[in-house]
From Swiss-Prot:
It comes from Schizosaccharomyces pombe (strain 972 / ATCC 24843) (Fission yeast). One of its GO terms (biological process) is translational elongation. This is Elongation factor 1-gamma. Residues 2-81 form the GST N-terminal domain. PANTHER family: ELONGATION FACTOR 1-GAMMA. Residues 219-261 are annotated as: Disordered.
């Protein structure tokens, strides 16, 4: 009988870790694939921050945070000590799990996100990430030289979690030849992969020969029209020379042809800039909003677990995203804010856009795939309150203080 349900994307090493722990412990759980910050209403009511993974027991017991879920599921099997047996082993298991959870996501992100999610590629950040991974692997390789498992003489949560991140890296960037340089990790990965039942949960063990290519932003500009071929016709030689061809104009923005409606988004930008947000700009917006030709969207960063960084760095992430939205600026207005604190924060916000399809408004930014978009209804009190708070910045959002933010106008 199932003890509950794990919610989250199985492609996430953190979600895979929780599902794997249950499988190894012999504890039956269900898995439901959900996107971060796009939980169903009943699940969002239990977990307002909407970060994955989360767990709900059959009796309704709610639990969030990767390590808490994994340790709970492991503890349900009293005969298999996946948490460790002695006090010292339990402490070491927690040490390795904590290290994996805090260090590996940030190390992998600069080299995986541009290949999987289309995030901008930062060469300097990628080099620093590669150096960090090499240091981490060197440390683990040295430790594994004289032992089969990280802690004790049996499989523990420490092994399962580290191997889930090894699989994450080996799926996209860590080639067979790269892993083979770390002889003991290479052997360890193949051993633990099967013991952690990853072959049954996801796919058989395999290696890649080349990292996935970096996703390049599409070139939106039309190529110049080809010159007509010259014909060997004497009359053509005597014909008047045509004027030099001009490059074809770039295609219009997809939203340019959408109905303008009665809402003047440029006027609202001026109102927002010149009037108090609560007493002036927000009442103006709700009075003039045209729901037939415009829509409002909640924007959330899809990988908040990776933002273990200072607030200013997360705010810079918003700034870069907004810069890359330049081609859509005439058709959108919005704010994104950093909620939380240094070392534990995320991005959320609200945008009004022309039309009802968010894709053409945001896909001009190569990193738009790193965000989740949820349509809002201004007639719902909770949605209206979120828009107000996201644009006013003067109240906590989702239970967290607004630390900083930026306006796209």
């Amino acid at each position: 009988m199932s003890v509950g349900t794990v919610y989250g994307k199985i492609g996430s090493p953190r979600v895979l870790f929780c599902v794997s722990v249950a499988a190894v412990a012999g504890v039956e759980v269900e898995h439901v694939d959900v996107q971060p910050h796009n939980f169903p209403a009943d699940l969002a009511a239990k977990f307002p921050l909407q970060k994955m993974p989360v767990f709900v027991g059959k009796d309704g017991f709610p639990l969030s945070e990767t390590l808490a879920i994994a340790f709970y599921l492991a503890s349900l099997n009293k005969t298999r000590a996946l948490n460790g047996t002695t006090a010292e082993e339990k402490a070491k298991v927690l040490q390795y799990c904590s290290f994996t959870n805090s260090e590996l996501p940030g190390a992998f992100r600069p080299i995986i996100a541009p290949r999987v999610f289309g995030a901008p590629y930062d060469e300097q950040a990628a080099k620093e990430a590669e150096t960090a991974i090499a240091l981490i692997f060197a440390r683990f390789d040295e430790e594994l030289a004289s032992k089969t498992y990280l802690v004790g003489s049996r499989l523990t949560l420490a092994d399962i979690f580290f191997t889930c991140f090894l699989k994450f890296g080996a799926t996209y960037v860590l080639t067979k030849s790269y892993l083979a340089k770390y002889t003991h990790i290479y052997r360890y990965y193949q051993t633990i992969y099967h013991q952690a039942k990853l072959d049954a949960i996801t796919e058989p063990l395999k290696f890649i020969d080349q990292p996935l290519p970096i996703i390049k932003a599409e070139n939106k500009e039309a190529a110049p029209a080809k010159k007509a071929e010259k014909k060997k016709d004497e009359k053509k030689k005597n014909a008047p020379k045509p004027q030099a061809e001009r490059p074809a104009k770039p295609p219009k923005h997809p939203l340019a042809s959408a109905p303008n409606g009665s809402f003047d988004i440029e006027e609202y930008k001026r109102v927002y800039s010149n009037q108090d947000t609560r007493s002036g700009a927000l009442p103006w917006f709700f009075e003039h909003f045209d729901p037939e030709n415009y829509s409002v969207w909640k924007v959330d960063y899809s990988y908040p677990e990776d933002l273990k960084q200072p607030v200013f760095m997360t705010n810079n992430l918003i700034g870069g995203f907004f810069q890359r939205l330049e081609a859509s600026r005439k058709y959108i207005f919005g704010c994104c804010v950093v909620i939380g604190e240094n070392g534990d924060n995320t991005i959320t916000g609200a945008f009004v856009i022309k039309g009802h399809d968010y894709v053409p408004a945001f896909d001009v930014a190569p990193d738009w795939g790193s965000y989740t978009f949820t349509k809002l209804d201004i007639n719902k009190p909770e949605d209206k309150a979120f828009i107000e708070d996201a644009w006013a910045w003067d109240k906590p959002i989702e239970g967290r203080e607004v630390a900083d933010g930026k306006v796209c106008k």
